[in-house]
Amino acid sequence: MRAFTPGASITEASRQKVLQAAEALNYSPNLLARSLATNVTHQVAVFVDDFANPHKLPVLEMLTERLQAEGLLTVLININRHFDHVHALINADQRQFDAVILFGTAFREETLGDRRLGPDFPPMFVLARDSQIPGVPAIACNAELALSQMVDYLFDKGYRRPGFMTGARTLSTALGRRHHYANFWRRKGVESVIELNADRYSADAGAEAARAYLSATPPPSRVDVLMCENDILALGAMDTARSEFGCRVPQDLAVVGFDNIELGATPTYGLTTYEQPTYEMINTIVEMITGARAVEAVTLPGHLVPRLSA
């Protein structure tokens, strides 16, 4: 097996002889058997619970491609009401993954204390959200910097009655965007930020939250700019504001998002948004998993993408 193991103690001449013989016999090493001996499976579990968000798929594509380039197989685990974080973590523990990536999921610290989890649980990483759990580092966009840039941009545009649409409560807390948005408006002298609540991250949820707010609020009292926690909420809110309430965007209501999904760039929306440093975040987390970089929390800067919606 040493001939098939990078860095193993074997001369190059001997390694080549073994590889040539293996090729002639159409032999390849049994990775399952090797994992029993080395306790390394070359498999990484990725937990996802927000499949309605179109930002997820391109990030997953980039993440899996980068992991595969390192010889790591990705196992996708769908977190939902029938298969929660505890079940997923137990499943990951039983399968002896080399690492677990929590992508777009938020869970409670006490989950890690579940007595059914083994003592040698694989290392966990949070991608694209904050983590306050000791030993579970987050690799994320710098939300404070992002919201500072966004509020500066909106303030310079003349907006003074801001609103913010949140998504699912547990995930919103992990994002921290609403908190920073309100803080930076206060620094501008704007004390109140109207909050709209969507119960999930989808265009329908964004439309429902916008409909409830616009129906209950007369035009003179409405916000003049609405930031949505992500782009798909913003697109749903824009559709409803324009088609059901006759709002002109941005003249009557400016709308901004976060993520820079492809649909938001189309002429139909022209959505002002913020792009996360996806490549850099993925590269960082893979380097930590492979041991090429120290394991630690990392925040990285993204960039503002101004368009016609604000």
Where are the model-predicted features located?
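Periplasmic-binding protein-like
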Residues: 45, 96-105, 163-165, 196, ...
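Flexible loop/turn connectors
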Residues: 215-310
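Glycine-rich phosphate-binding loop signature in dinucleotide/nucleotide-binding domains
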Residues: 25, 93-96, 157-158, 213-222, ...
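N-terminal helix-turn-helix DNA-binding module of bacterial transcription factors
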Residues: 1-39
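Alpha-helical recognition/docking segments in bacterial nutrient-uptake
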Residues: 39-152, 156
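A short helix->loop->beta-strand "cap" motif at the edges of active sites that frequently abuts
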Residues: 119-124, 190, 250-253
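Hinge/beta->alpha junction and helix N-cap segments in small-molecule ligand-binding domains
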Residues: 48-58, 76-85, 139-149, 165-186, ...
